[in-house]
Amino acid sequence: VMCDAQHKMSKRNGDPSYEDLIREGYLTEAVLNYVALLGWSPKGENAEREFFTLQELAEIFDISGISKSPAVFDLDKLRWMNAEYMKKLSPEAFFAKAEPVLKTVITNPAIDLKAVAALVQPRCEILSDLPERVDFIDRLPEYSTELYVHKKSKTTLENSLSSLREILPVLESLEVWTNEGLYEALVALAAKLELKNSVVLWPLRVAVSGKASTPGGATELCALLGKE
C-alpha cells in the first residue's frame, strides 16, 4: 500500500496506523471497508458497490479481484467513507460515540448534548473534528467583523448591523423558542423589512457563533443555545 505514487506507507514517515485512525475518530467499520477495497475489487453484481459489512466482504472475497498494481491510500476518500458511515448510525449510536468528545468542549450543563449530537451528525466526518465545530457553544470566540460580509447572502457590515438591531427586539419578545418558531419570526421580519432572508439570518448566525462555518443555521443554533 502506497501513500502516494512513489512511496510506500510507513509509520516511520508519519503515515497513520489503524490505532491512529481509531484515536482520531474514524469508525472501525469504515476503516475495514476502505482497506478491504485497496488493491481489490468485487466482481459481478457487486462491482459498483462501495459499502460492505465485514461479513459481506468475507462472503464475496475472491482472489481474482486483487490488482497487480500497488494501491494508494487516499485519506480524503477514507474521510468521505467515514462520513457516510457516521450518517448511517442511529442517533443513539452516534451520541454514544460523540458524547465523550463533546464533553471535552461543552461544560455548560444547560446545553442538551443529545441535541448537539443530532445537529452535528449529518455533517460529521470524523469525531476529532467535533471540538472545533462546537467550541463556540461554551464561549463565543473572538472573530473578525469581516465575517458579516458574505457575497452569496448579500450582506455587508452596514446591513448586518442594521439587521441585528432589528432582530434583537424580535428575539427578546419571542415566546416560542424553537427552531421552527425562530425561523418563522425571522422570516416574517425579513419580509417586513423587504430584505432577503439571508440578510437577516447570516448576521445572526455569525453573531451567535463567531464562525463562518457552523453545524447548523442561525435558527438551529439559537434554539440549541437557548433564549437566555
Please place each PLM-identified region on the residue numbering.
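Alpha-helical recognition segments enriched in aromatics with Gly/Pro capping
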Residues: 1-88, 93, 100, 202-213
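Alpha-helical hairpin
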Residues: 2, 152-155, 225
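Short, mixed-charge aromatic SLiMs
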Residues: 4-7, 59-66, 105, 124, ...
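Secondary-structure capping and boundary motifs in well-ordered enzyme cores
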Residues: 23, 70, 112, 193-197, ...
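Residue-level detector of well-ordered alpha-helical segments, enriched
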Residues: 30, 77, 94, 112-119, ...
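Small-residue-rich helix-loop
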Residues: 91-193
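Charged substrate- and nucleic-acid-binding regions of tRNA-handling and nucleotidyl-transfer enzymes
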Residues: 180-228
